[in-house]
Amino acid sequence: MSSEELACKLQRRLRLEVRAETDQGDPQPAPCDAPAGHPEPEPPARAPTASADSELNLKLSRRLDIHQGTARPGRSKVFNPYTEFPEFSRRLLKDLEKMFKTYDAGRDGFIDLMELKLMMEKLGAPQTHLGLKSMIKEVDEDFDGKLSFREFLLIFHKAAAGELQEDSGLLALAKFSEIDVALEGVRGAKNFFEAKAQALSCSSKFEAELKAEQEERKREEEARRLRQAAFRELKAAFSA
């Protein structure tokens, strides 16, 4: 079936659907008995409204895009950075989240153009207006003109994978950010993350990191307990 035939069929079907929805949404007047000898006049044909036509065009375009394979799949609202970016350690993800929240001045969960401008200036890599727009466009998957936390993580994912150009503002962002991935080196991070991913599965890696965090907390608690005991002994010696 050609695209023209498919478009005609979809358009015809969608017009029927929209017309049916419109008919259901509008209350119909109760029928009344026509006087004897006077036939009931035919109701005028309903003209399609502008909103119905707009909805029809949107639905038709969406279905054609799906059929042609050009439609972008809807993204799940639930975002789990640990499963979507398994090459990043828990500590690195926490550092990146802290950095994202630092520059999200509006506290709306996004870094807009102005916030990105201030961010790059503080990192020592100021960008032009067009450069900032190009930076956002490179990872802006939902085309909203700003960076979500997932898109922010995507910057460092691309940097670690060597997918950014040398003159890219995003590469400058990844290099100048004061987090672990910068200390590893953008190029060296690729091998580092690949080695980590090969050495440990996602689940075992998280278990090892959680265990290390628990051990670190135990050591800190033990050190605090020893300091308190030493302080009590010193206090008792002076009190005697």
Swiss-Prot record:
- What cystine linkages occur within this chain? none
Q: Where is the EF-hand domain?
A: 91-126, 127-162
Q: Name one GO biological process term.
A: regulation of cellular hyperosmotic salinity response
Q: What superkingdom heads the lineage?
A: Eukaryota
Q: Which residues bind Ca(2+) 2?
A: 140, 142, 144, 146, 151
Task: Please give the PROSITE patterns that the UniProt record associates with this protein.
Answer: EF_HAND_2 (PS50222)
Spell out the protein name for this chain: EF-hand domain-containing protein D1
Q: Which residues bind Ca(2+) 1?
A: 104, 108, 115
Q: Which SMART domains match?
A: EFh
The encoding gene is: Efhd1
For this record, an example GO cellular component is: mitochondrial inner membrane
| Role played | Acts as a calcium sensor for mitochondrial flash (mitoflash) activation, an event characterized by stochastic bursts of superoxide production. May play a role in neuronal differentiation.
GO molecular function annotation: calcium ion binding; calcium ion sensor activity
Disordered: region residues: 17-54
